[in-house]
Structures are given as structure tokens and as C-alpha cells.
Design a protein with these regions (language model features):
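Short, low-complexity disordered leader/linker segments with a strong preference
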Residues: 2, 28-33
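Short non-domain terminal segments
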Residues: 10, 19, 41-42
Length: 270
């Protein structure tokens, strides 16, 4: 009898050890994105801005920022491009953000699918629009796997001041610049929605009414979205409203710092 009891206790201890080991190792395995057997990261929100407001050095500068951040976390083997549109200029056609990122699917740091296709990402059909993509606060992660601090996380009146925000990583910074309409395409060229195609850090002069967040002729501005889907306008992930200007100091006044979406180019671009 004692022998049987002893064997039962030994078996029990082994089972407990296995369960404890599984509980510890399983979450670690989920976090090891890009490891053999895992789902490679193909989408992220930049953890930090370039730092010159809407002047990103054009699309090339934004793409390089995506590539550099991805490389630091071991995801540099993919080709990364920024989800940004540019507006038409004389002799230069517009570029649509949706045409820069391939066909999908895209997964975040944790291997969670954000969208299965361009149509799913943008809600191109009524059915897909009703379904929505899977980009929200818990999935719109940075390349480091962090949630972007949002509207109600750490309330502090100073989070509209760049001097405070730049040294406070948990401050509200849930606006992501896109320069795009909700379908992922560029705006017409008559009003600035892209900080002059990502080359300007200018702010509107005193002649402009800054009480609203809509663009106007001659007014420096950039269109933003919300990865957490919380904020002004329509709460869209990629096209909600404009900003107070294009300088680094102006972006935090509406709770942004110049972060943007990066996608690994999947499939063949359109």
C-alpha cells in the first residue's frame, strides 16, 4: 500500500511540474515572434517618431525608419514600407498608402492577424466594412510588442507639450500619421493632408483658424488615424482628422508624436 501511495505521489508531482513548466514556457513561446514555427511580424506601429514633425524625409525617409526599427528587433529580413500616401504634384502622380504594402495577410508582434488582405484592411465591401479589420488598442502594437499609450491611460495635462512628451514614454500618443483617406488612397492635391508629402515641419500662420482640425488651402496639415479607435472625428484607424500643424511641437497638441504604421511588403504590390 505504501509503495502504491508513493508511486501515486510521484506521479502527481511529475504532473504538477509539467503543468507549471507549460504555464511558464507557453507565454514565452508566444512572445518569441519570428522564431522557428512562429508567425513572423509583418505589421507594427513605430515605437518612436523620426522627430522632425511631418518632415520624414519623404517616403524614402519613412521607409528607412520602418526598416531600421524592424532590423533592431530582428525582423529586418523583410522589406518594410510606411503606410503613407502622397498627394499629386505637377508631373508627379499621387501615391496611395494601400498600394505600398502588398496583398496581406499581416500579423503583429504577437502573431495576431491584423488583416487578411487589402480589402479586409480597408473594408472595401459592405460585408468587410461591417466585419472590420482586427486593428485596435490591444493589437496595434509597436515593433517591440508594446501597446501605444492612449486617450485614457495616463491622464496628464502636460501630454500636449512636446518637451514633456518626448521624455515621458507613457504619455498619450495615440495618433498615427497616414495622410490618407479611409480607403487608403491619397487626397486630392488642393488641400495639404501630408505635410507637403512628408517634407515639411511648418505650422499654420496667425491668419488660420485653428479651432478645428480640418485642412484648408495653404494650411500645413496632416491626416491621422487611431490604432486604439478612440478619439475625435470618426475614430478611424487610418483617417480621422487633421492636426494643428506639421512641426514636432504641434503634433502633441492633438495627442500624436509622428508615429506611423509599418507593413512588411507581402505578395506583389499593386
Amino acid at each position: 500500500m505504501k509503495s502504491e501511495v508513493g508511486e501515486d505521489m510521484s506521479t502527481f508531482r511529475i504532473l504538477v511540474s509539467i503543468l507549471v513548466f507549460s504555464a511558464v514556457v507557453a507565454p514565452m513561446a508566444v512572445a518569441q515572434h519570428g522564431m522557428p514555427g512562429g508567425i513572423p511580424m509583418s505589421f507594427f506601429v513605430t515605437s518612436e517618431p523620426i522627430g522632425d514633425g511631418g518632415n520624414l524625409g519623404g517616403l524614402a525617409g519613412a521607409d528607412a525608419h520602418c526598416q531600421n526599427l524592424a532590423t533592431v528587433v530582428g525582423a529586418g529580413d523583410s522589406t518594410w514600407q510606411a503606410y503613407l500616401s502622397t498627394q499629386a504634384r505637377p508631373g508627379k502622380p499621387a501615391i496611395n498608402a494601400r498600394d505600398r504594402i502588398g496583398e496581406g495577410p499581416w500579423h503583429n508582434y504577437d502573431g495576431v492577424m491584423i488583416a487578411s488582405s487589402l480589402a479586409h484592411l480597408h473594408g472595401d465591401t459592405l460585408e468587410l466594412a461591417r466585419m472590420g479589420n482586427n486593428l485596435h488598442k490591444q493589437t496595434g502594437l509597436t515593433e517591440k510588442g508594446a501597446i501605444v499609450p492612449g486617450l485614457y491611460d495616463y491622464l496628464d495635462p502636460r501630454d500636449r507639450d512636446w518637451e514633456y512628451v518626448k521624455t515621458t514614454p507613457y504619455s498619450n500618443r495615440h495618433e498615427v500619421i497616414t495622410g490618407s483617406q479611409t480607403d487608403g488612397r491619397a487626397y486630392p492635391p488642393d488641400i495639404d493632408y501630408t505635410c507637403d508629402n512628408w517634407t515639411s515641419n511648418a505650422d499654420p500662420g496667425p491668419e488660420f483658424d485653428l479651432s478645428g482640425l480640418s485642412g484648408g488651402a495653404g494650411r500645413p496639415n496632416v491626416q491621422i488615424g487611431f490604432p486604439d479607435r478612440e478619439g475625435g472625428g470618426n475614430g478611424s484607424w487610418n483617417s480621422s482628422h487633421g492636426t494643428r500643424g506639421c512641426s514636432q511641437a504641434a503634433l502633441p497638441r492633438t495627442h500624436g508624436i509622428g508615429q506611423f504604421y509599418c507593413f512588411a511588403v507581402t505578395g506583389e504590390t499593386q
